Amino acid sequence: MSEPLKPRIDFAEPLKEESTSAFKAQQTFSEAESRTFAPAAIDERPEDEGAAEAAVDAALRPKRSLWRKMVMGGLALFGASVVGQGVQWTMNAWQTQDWVALGGCAAGALIIGAGVGSVVTEWRRLWRLRQRAHERDEARELLHSHSVGKGRAFCEKLAQQAGIDQSHPALQRWYAAIHETQNDREIVGLYANLVQPVLDAQARREISRFAAESTLMIAVSPLALVDMAFIAWRNLRLINRIATLYGIELGYYSRLRLFRLVLLNIAFAGASELVREVGMDWMSQDLAARLSTRAAQGIGAGLLTARLGIKAMELCRPLPWIDNDKPRLGDFRRQLIGQLKETLQKSKSSPEK
């Protein structure tokens, strides 16, 4: 049998060369580079939280504008002139034996010294607040690092700043859990799981107490002006308490700066969460029909105080939030509603008796 004819093959066109992918050059890593290797951190924060953190970082970063430099230069020149004039007056009073003028110069020197000392103290406290943000960034790097040698010293510094004694049970458990073969990420992670929750629990209790006081005060107070003054005072006290728990001593300007940062963070990231949390609870339990208007306002004020405390924790904390250890507004919401219900029931049952 004859095979079928094959089709014609035309060799007129040139052959196409197969494209081969060029190999990349070989990369070698030394022993030192392998120890300091850190994987790239993926930012999984929501868009609103990213905007809030950007606003906080921008507020923490000092702004070096031309006008500020001119003002600082003018103040420095004025201070030097005052000191020079004071020295000249003191020398003239000493030469002429004008004891009254000499006493005035001494009093002025004491006042100026006290003013300079207070300015230096405020600057040091404000610098400490900024330094806490750098420590948080360093902790975030250590939590993604495989190097060895920095984690233990960093955690011991944090414990010393927070006033945790070496004989504290949580710190003793941390010392017993770490060993030389662990890297910085594991050591800092153990500190975050064993020691840091002790301070976080104290801060949570303070937030719960202050939020409950704000809720009950607004619910029973008939004067709006008194409510505003009370809430402002209690919120400042809450910020001071949380900062003290985390080892930060606030001055006048650093307190105002922290309060402004907290309000900025709430304005960017807290409004949607607050509306969602309150709306879900009110729609599910129909509290608007059972509670008075003052009680509803009290719950709102308590939730804002709790939100303020959570953000103050986030700014004063030396470690970033890990996993799900960040306090949730819903936990405080349920606690506030339960306390308010109990208080209203007691107030209704007391007149009947």
From Swiss-Prot:
Electron transport as UniProt keyword: no
Coiled-coil regions, chain positions: none
Name assigned to this protein: UPF0283 membrane protein YcjF
Species the sequence originates in: Salmonella heidelberg (strain SL476)
Pfam families given in the database record: DUF697 (PF05128)
Start-end of Polar residues biased regions: 20-31
Subcellular location: Cell inner membrane
GO cellular component, one term: plasma membrane
Top-level taxon of origin: Bacteria
Family under the similarity heading: Belongs to the UPF0283 family.
Transmembrane segments: 70-90, 100-120, 213-233
Residues covered by region (Disordered): 16-35
Keywords on record: Cell inner membrane, Cell membrane, Membrane, Transmembrane, Transmembrane helix
Membrane topology reported for the UniProt record: Multi-pass membrane protein
